[in-house]
Amino acid sequence: TLERRWGLKIKARGIYRDAVRSSQSHFVKCSGLRWVCLMLLSPISWANKIWALPFLTVLAPSKRYHEKQGKKHKALSDWARQICYLLHRWLPDFQLIIVGDGAYSVLELLAATRNYVTWITRFRIDAALYDFPPSEKRARPGRPPSNGKKQIALWQRLYCPLTKWQEVTFSHWYDEQNKSMEIASGIALWYRSGKPPVPIRWVLIRDPKGKLDPIPLQCTDLSLSPIQIVQHYLKRWQVEVTFEEVRAHLGVETQRQWSDLSILRTTPALMALFSVITLWADTLNSWQKLTVFQTAWYFKPYPTFSDAVASVRYRI
């Protein structure tokens, strides 16, 4: 995520695209700090929702910062690869599924970590996809082929009459309502010259009413069904909800510190505080149900994070 910050003494800040204020036809730049945040998507029974609980937050400095320091720049995918190795070291016996946006749909990242974690990300609709190489042995000399025949691109499958679409009703769409969508899926090798090929399952999602743009997804676990992949990806929206909650209630983006160490410590601590407050609220709810604070213009059937913060503050 992007923490919007200004200041000449903030060394690690950079100029990035503001995903909230930008659109396909309008590009908005913003100054700030880029953070890579790993969260646990966990169901919260008393909130009747899935919440994203941060437990590891890493600063990804800008390219300009590394150039001034005389260091090699680490891209966002490099930080993500290092985090995956650390997570696998912590939890070697767990099946780990990481859901991310299109920034993590990087061929080198998926190839380096697919033996440790399963990636589900938004995919490039113009990615070069190939069939698997033939398994039979060939008599001609040379190294065996790394890929087979090239498949048609995903954007071409949207209009191909041979594409088989399946209509599925998802009970937890982005607005928490039932939504009927059409999905198509297949298995392919994602390959670029000079890069290791990665077997993926691609999923295309389109709105039968034509109101929403098509959504391409990819998953590095070929055993997951297309419906499971879409259901996992829909949970990613809770990550954006957590970012908004920490901005509104925990003071992220309102800090005034500028030294390197204070920046490295404060924002990860505030992100982790979201998870700590949730655990405290869960303990309080086991003793007595949390109070749901209502407003005149909106009815809340279940407690939200603001109610959890209020309950914890009252107990403290």
What are the residue ranges of the model-derived segments?
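Single, function-defining residue in the core of a domain
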Residues: 5-10, 49-316
